[in-house]
Design a protein with these regions (language model features):
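Glycine-rich acetyl-CoA-binding "A-motif" of GNAT/NAT acetyltransferases
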Residues: 377-380, 418, 439-442
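Bateman (tandem CBS) regulatory domains
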Residues: 246, 330-345, 352, 397-409
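PLP-dependent amino-acid enzyme catalytic core
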Residues: 1-335
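The conserved cystathionine-beta-synthase
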Residues: 346-365, 372-373, 390, 410-429, ...
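Short glycine/proline-centered loop/turn elements that form peptide/ligand docking sites
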Residues: 98-101, 344-345, 354
Length: 458
């Protein structure tokens, strides 16, 4: 294999590998996954970011030292941040508040200014991320709103790079391509190129349940928008760049199916990809299994799963969202979000130092820990206990937890009635749930609300 020398990180964008999947049930079909997660910014949106910035420079819309503003669910922002850092542009990104923390940390590490806005409002609301970004661009002197949703350089990136790469990799023999739609650039660009070079190639839409796009494909109409957790695809409006009239079939994919499929992809094929990949792969597998003759089908690993480790690949988060079902016991243990017998509860021992406890609190983003001795709860320590006992003296961080913890602990047997749990929570306390004397876990008000919500969802 010839190893190439590159002179800029932007030279690494594109020419991503194509992997045939062998360990998933693809029916009579051959299913290929284009590994866009191998781009330097970690997603297919690197292609779009490079194309849009280059075209803006060519048209004189961006001058050295200029400011770029964009609305993004994350990956376009990462691509823009990567290129903006190389070209010394200031970048301001408006992002929905459902974006993973890893993406936000990555964006800020690249030097971007990240402004969070609501993800529970629709287009036309002043807090909607696209409306917010457009307004911000109007108010910022010399700023260029790159506007991926209406920027022709977006689909151009796929018509000039992604499409011919696929065609070459599969020697011109592609029966179907499964895509998702966020801005619509991938679908629009691929369709434009394949219509000319491979008219037989069908386009399949993978759409998160709650998005309106699958309805538009199936019926030409759409109703009210729902909500979904998958990031980067699905919309509450029809993106101008999306050529939905050319879509052959649309599949609606729930968050549960998408997340489990992405996790399965990692477990059986070794590919760490993000939540939108789970949506695309779920639809691709359904399409493949529905065929009566062999076909060559392509879909995408849209981005890297390393941005979803705290969410989709975190069992505790998945349970809290109701995406991993835990068998109900019919007692108070059903309200425990982080169970001790599953290794999910962060605990302390009486002889641990306050410094060690504080480190655990910061590491796991929690404010209190149960203190265990021989499997029994002997106290609870929280941030206020640390404040009262340290009192600005760093030396006191070496004190043992036993000197700072609260020994007044409300312990409920798991067989107690829910009314007793509610009585404890009504007093602003945390309930300790036990099986006889064996500690099972803590229950907070938030845990109760989460359990109730998940019961409704199921």
């Amino acid at each position: 294999m010839v190893m190439s020398l590159f002179h800029s990180v932007s030279d690494l964008i594109g020419h991503t590998p194509l992997l045939q999947l062998h360990k998933l049930d693809t029916g009579p079909c051959s299913l290929f996954l284009k590994l866009e997660n191998q781009n330097p910014g970690g997603s297919i949106k690197d292609r779009v970011a490079l194309s849009m910035i280059n075209e803006a420079e060519r048209q004189g819309k961006l001058a050295p030292g200029g400011t770029i503003i964009e609305a993004t669910a994350g990956n376009t922002g990462l691509g823009l941040a990567l290129i903006a850092a190389q070209k010394n542009y200031r970048l301001i990104l408006v992002v929905p508040d459902k974006m993973s923390r890893e993406k936000i940390f990555h964006l800020r590490a690249l030097g971007a200014t990240v402004l969070l806005t609501r993800s529970d409002v629709n287009k036309g609301h002043p807090a909607y991320y696209q409306d917010y970004a457009r307004r911000l661009a109007d108010e910022t002197p010399g700023a260029f709103y790159i506007d991926q949703f209406n920027n022709d350089a977006n689909p151009l990136a796929h018509a000039t790079s992604t499409a011919p790469e696929l065609y070459q990799q599969l020697e011109g023999d592609i029966d179907a391509i499964v895509v998702g739609v966020g801005s619509g650039g991938t679908l629009g660009g691929l369709q434009a190129w394949f219509a000319e070079h491979s008219p037989k190639t069908e386009f399949i839409l993978a759409d998160p349940a709650g998005s309106i796009l699958a309805d538009q494909v199936d019926t030409g109409r759409y109703g009210e928008t729902g909500s979904w957790l998958v990031e980067g695809i699905g919309e509450d409006f029809i993106p101008p760049l999306a050529r939905l009239e050319g879509v052959h079939t649309a599949y609606r994919v729930s968050d549960r199916e998408a997340f489990h499929t992405a996790r399965q992809l990692l477990q059986v094929e070794g590919v760490l990809a993000g939540s939108s990949t789970g949506t695309l792969l779920s639809a691709a597998l359904r399409y493949c299994r529905a065929q009566s003759r062999p076909k060559r089908v392509v879909t995408f690993a849209c981005d890297s799963g390393n941005k979803y480790l705290s969410k989709m690949f975190n069992d505790d988060w998945m349970r809290q969202q109701g995406l991993i079902a835990r068998p109900e016991q019919g007692d108070l243990s059903d309200f425990i979000a982080l169970r001790h017998d599953e290794g999910a509860t962060v605990t302390a021992a009486p002889d641990d130092t306050l410094a060690a406890v504080f480190t655990r609190m910061r590491l796991y983003d929690i404010s209190q820990l149960p203190v265990l001795e021989d499997g029994r709860v002997v106290g609870i320590v929280d941030e206020w206990d640390l404040i009262r006992h340290v009192q600005g003296d760093r030396q006191r961080f070496s004190l043992p937890v036993s000197e700072a913890m609260s020994r007044h602990v409300e312990i409920l047997d798991k067989r107690a009635p829910e009314s007793e749990l509610q009585a404890i929570l009504d007093r602003g306390l945390v309930a300790v749930i036990a099986d006889n004397t064996r500690f099972l876990g803590l229950v907070t008000r938030s845990d109760v609300l989460t359990a109730w919500r998940n019961r409704v969802a199921q």
